[in-house]
């Protein structure tokens, strides 16, 4: 019986420690910050996994074509391997080019690089697009699921699916497995990305905190896209194919465990929190003209980036005889203006929150001008400046319009954010599903100059459309969520409640001014007008 006393004391001490840690984690402000960290890590992982395969998969598929699991060793003449591309520079591998490295240097042993054939370029393009395609298909279902289940459980599901996808990438040995892993990542992203952004909007209901938190999330997305190709290329070169994926899988598992500790998604309190008001169906949100304008802007602003990624390297080689390091480094400086754009928009939104539409329109104009200038660049430095302008404009649009979506749901619908951010994810996925597959064909049929000018013109023409959002900042939460629920036909005792609500409104309650879509009042009767 003597050993039981120390055991009981240890158990009691562990219980007290667990309770103390749990109480600290449940403190509202601290929990909100931890949730932001968890979501940012999830977004970082998703974008790192999206880009980490850029220097790995094309080379590995070429090795499989050669009939060997590992690159061939040569001892007399060495050929330099491609430097790992940066940010979204998948073009060094996706472009239809048969560039061969130049023999140089002293005699030493090194891995011989292999390059995809033209047919493999098509397979790699489909592989890169498969993630966005599945994400595009799943988001109309994941949004309502998130609205019904709250945000923590779908985020946990997304992290679990991303963990499985990453492990599958690590042990993949053929194209079919790579394709399945990439598609599985799209399934995980449809849950993790949408629920993560929606959770931030829910935890930070007031401005400017909401814009600031979403800006931090966008910075992590950009950083993940930037750091993933060199991270994957270096580890692939020195540690093998599996190591970068296993590292990302470990971080994904840690993030999921941290979410379990902080949010406790399966506890009784979490089940009580899950009793959210019934959200507006996603098809009705899609028909809301304000939300449609924002979704169109998000798609339009991302098309130049998605279409330039797989084509710009070949154009650089043919136009300015760019070296391999220039093609690999061309996107690297763009991270700085992207973060600067996020910071600037957050600061401006804090001071002038009613001008979010103007920041988005300015971003579209900057994207349009930058895209039109790209074909005129004949050297490396001007091209870098143009791409920096492109990413700066994208930061303005994303940082201004993502909080606007949450605000529109607050004032025109029910404050449940899963479906509206599923629409935002659909907007991004449209661009990135088409880019790797369509961009090369457009360049071959029309030319790179026509592609860039067309995308720039589309952004310039769409910028004035955001004028339709100019009155959004003047809308107020003139009706509560309870009032929205009472729009349904009353039953039983609720007749009296509805009667009192109607009588209260006859007293001259202040109303919000109408927007340019006041003709849609009958369909979206969620705010009053004088």
From Swiss-Prot:
SUPFAM superfamilies from the UniProt entry: MFS general substrate transporter (SSF103473)
Chain intervals for the UniProt region annotation (Mediates interaction with SEC14L1): 471-530
Positions of the UniProt region annotated as Disordered: 504-530
Lumenal, vesicle topological domain residue ranges: 55-125, 174-182, 235-242, 310-325, 378-388, 444-447
Known glycosylation sites: 89, 96
Predominant localisation class: membrane
Distribution of this protein across tissues and organs: Expressed in the spinal cord, brain (excluding the cerebellum), brain stem and cholinergic tissues. Not expressed in peripheral tissues such as liver and kidney.
Keywords, alphabetical: Cytoplasmic vesicle, Glycoprotein, Membrane, Neurotransmitter transport, Synapse, Transmembrane, Transmembrane helix, Transport
Stored PANTHER family: GH10249P (PTHR23506), VESICULAR ACETYLCHOLINE TRANSPORTER (PTHR23506:SF13)
Oligomer and partners: Interacts with SEC14L1.
Entry protein name: Vesicular acetylcholine transporter
Organism in which the protein naturally occurs: Mus musculus (Mouse)
């Amino acid at each position: 019986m003597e050993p039981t006393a120390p055991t009981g004391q240890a158990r009691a001490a562990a219980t007290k420690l667990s309770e103390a840690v749990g109480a600290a984690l449940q403190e509202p402000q601290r929990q909100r910050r931890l949730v932001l960290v968890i979501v940012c890590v999830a977004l970082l992982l998703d974008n790192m996994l999206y880009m980490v395969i850029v220097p790995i998969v094309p080379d590995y598929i070429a090795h499989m074509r050669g009939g060997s699991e590992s690159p061939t060793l040569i001892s007399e003449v060495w050929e330099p391997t491609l430097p790992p591309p940066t940010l979204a520079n998948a073009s060094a591998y996706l472009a239809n080019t048969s560039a061969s490295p130049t023999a140089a240097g002293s005699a030493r042993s090194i891995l011989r690089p292999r390059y995809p054939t033209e047919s493999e370029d098509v397979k790699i393009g489909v592989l890169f697009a498969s993630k966005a395609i599945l994400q595009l298909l799943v988001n109309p279902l994941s949004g309502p699921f998130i609205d019904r289940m709250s945000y923590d459980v779908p985020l946990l599901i997304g992290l679990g699916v991303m963990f499985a996808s990453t492990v599958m990438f690590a042990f993949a040995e053929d194209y079919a497995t790579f394709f399945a892993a990439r598609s599985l990542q799209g399934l995980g992203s449809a849950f993790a990305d949408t629920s993560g952004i929606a959770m931030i909007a829910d935890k930070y209901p007031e401005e400017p905190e909401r814009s600031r938190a979403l800006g931090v999330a966008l910075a992590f997305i950009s950083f993940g896209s930037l750091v993933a190709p060199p991270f994957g290329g270096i580890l692939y070169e020195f540690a093998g194919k599996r190591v970068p994926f296993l590292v990302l899988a470990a971080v994904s598992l840690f993030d999921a465990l941290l979410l379990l500790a902080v949010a406790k998604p399966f506890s009784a309190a979490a089940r009580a929190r899950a009793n959210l008001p019934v959200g507006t169906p996603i098809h009705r949100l899609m028909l809301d003209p304000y939300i449609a304008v924002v979704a169109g802007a998000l798609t339009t602003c991302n098309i130049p980036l998605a279409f330039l990624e797989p084509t710009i390297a070949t154009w650089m080689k043919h136009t300015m005889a760019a070296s391999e390091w220039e093609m690999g480094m061309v996107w690297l400086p763009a991270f700085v203006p992207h973060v600067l754009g996020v910071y600037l928009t957050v600061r401006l939104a804090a001071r002038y929150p009613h001008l979010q539409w103007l920041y988005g329109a300015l971003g579209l104009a900057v994207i349009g001008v930058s895209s039109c200038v790209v074909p005129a660049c004949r050297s490396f430095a001007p091209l870098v400046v143009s791409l920096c302008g492109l990413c700066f404009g994208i930061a303005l649009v994303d940082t201004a319009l993502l909080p606007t979506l949450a605000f529109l749901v607050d004032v025109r619908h029910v404050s449940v954010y899963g479906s509206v951010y599923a629409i935002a994810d659909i907007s991004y996925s449209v661009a990135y599903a088409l880019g790797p597959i369509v961009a090369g064909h457009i360049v071959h049929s029309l030319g790179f100059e026509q592609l860039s000018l067309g995308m720039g013109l589309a952004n310039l023409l769409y910028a004035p459309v955001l004028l339709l959002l100019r009155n959004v900042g003047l809308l107020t939460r003139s009706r509560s969520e309870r009032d929205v629920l009472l729009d349904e036909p009353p039953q039983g005792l609720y007749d009296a409640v509805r009667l009192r609500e109607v009588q209260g409104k006859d007293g001259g309650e202040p109303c919000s001014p109408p927007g340019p879509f006041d003709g849609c009042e009958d369909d979206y009767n969620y705010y009053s007008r004088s």
